[in-house]
Structure formats: C-alpha cells, structure tokens
Amino acid sequence: MLGKRTEILLISALMCGIIGYAGLGLAIAGTRIAAAEGTVNTVVSHQNTLNATFRSINIQLTALGTRSSFDAPQAIALVETSVANAELASRTVSHDDVSLRNADRGLHEHPWLTVVSNAAVDRATNRIRHARQALAIARSLAADQVQEGRFWQALYSGLGDLGELNRQKEAGNLPGARQALTRMGRDVEQAAALAGSTGLPAELAALTTDLHKLAADYTRQLDAEAAEHYDAAAAISVDVSADMSRIAGFDVDGIGSKVDAFFRPRIDRYNQEIEAATA
C-alpha cells in the first residue's frame, strides 16, 4: 500500500511539474511574443513617414520644371529638406533594426522554455524577418536619396551662380561676374562628381558637361571683354548662347520618369515586405 501511495505521489508531482512547465513556458512565450509584436508594429507605424520621404526623391526635380522662374535659394532649401528627411529616415531605420534584432534574439533565448508555443514563436519570427527585409530596402533607399540630394544641391548652386553671373555681366560688373563664374565652376565640378550616384540617369552627367563647357566659354568671353577684344568677345558669345540653348533643352519630365522608374520597384518591394510583416 505504501508503495502504491508513493507511486501516486510521484505521478502527481510529475504532473504538477509538467503543468507548471507548460504554464511557465506559455507565460514566457507570451511575454516574448508580445514584445516582438510590439516592436514589429512600431516599425510598421513608420511606413507612411518613410513612404513620404521616398516620394520626395522626384520633388527635387520640380524646381527645374519652370526654368524661367528658377529660384535657386528656394530649390536648394527644398533639396536640403529632402536630404534632412532622408538622413532622419536612415537613423529611424537603424534604430528599428536594432530593436527587431533584439526582439528576435529574445524570442529564441532558452528555446526549451517555449516549446509549447513554437507555432506562435515561428509566426512572430516570420513577421520580424519581413520587417527587417523591409528595413534593409529602406536603408538603401535613404542612402541613395541622400547622395542624389547632394547632387541636386551642387547642381542648383551652380545654376544659381549662373544666374548671378548673368546679372553681374549685364550690370557691367566684370569682377562680380568672375566671382560668380568661379563659384559656378566649383559647384558644377561637385555636381559632376556626384552625377553617377545611384538612380541618376546619364543625361545628368551630360548636363554637367554642358555646364562645364558654358563656364569655359563664358571665361573666354570675359577675358576677351577685359582685353577689349570686342570682336572676339562677340564671336565667343555665339558659343555661350549655344551652350545656354542646349542646357535649356534639358528634359525635366523625361529625367523624372527615369528616376521614378529606377526607384519605384524598390519602394514597392519595401511596402510588400511591410505588408507581409503585418500578416
């Protein structure tokens, strides 16, 4: 009888242990899954802000849409805002990715404790995987947008210098014109160095080449005028006018379409991964 009672006590203790283990496992898994789900939801909540940032990639082009009323300071301010937003997006993505990595690590600590909730843990893991894939895409988009923005900053600065050059020359202020020309050369050089940035069409490199030629021809014209070689200056002005016409033929809409065609698939993939993370 004593042996039988001992067996019953041992079985009862074992059952209590199993029930306790299962209960503890469920509690631990529930806490970890809730933390992971909360982290994923935070990442998903940033989707609209990041999409707005990515949509501003082509906004940087709008300042050239009406070249007759081109406002260099306004255009540069627009680009600076876009770059600042992209840099903020990059920081947000990095912070979110660290949070997701920590949440994923937490889900899989001491896996023997969460065996009873493996299916739920796997679902949370899958959500984290999709969210991190979305962030990897977002990180590359933000980095590309920063580089592209720096190109537009340099280009718009160069175009602003060109406007100032024309104003100074028309006012007969040759020293002022030369100063503007020097700034233009520096800014165009910087734009040319960035023209190969990811997502920028080849036409933009050609545009910086045209601006280089314009700066060189303008320098020749100013030199001729300073030396009072007015016939030579008049002949060179024909080249300057041709340069201006070529630059004025810059196809803003066509460039915008190419930029959009390059970035749109990546933006779509980002949104698809976010949608998968919410499933």
Feature-to-residue mapping (PLM):
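C-terminal amphipathic alpha-helix
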Residues: 44-66, 116-279
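Leu/Val/Ala/Ile-rich N-terminal alpha-helices, chiefly Sec-type signal peptides and the beginnings
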Residues: 2-141, 258-279
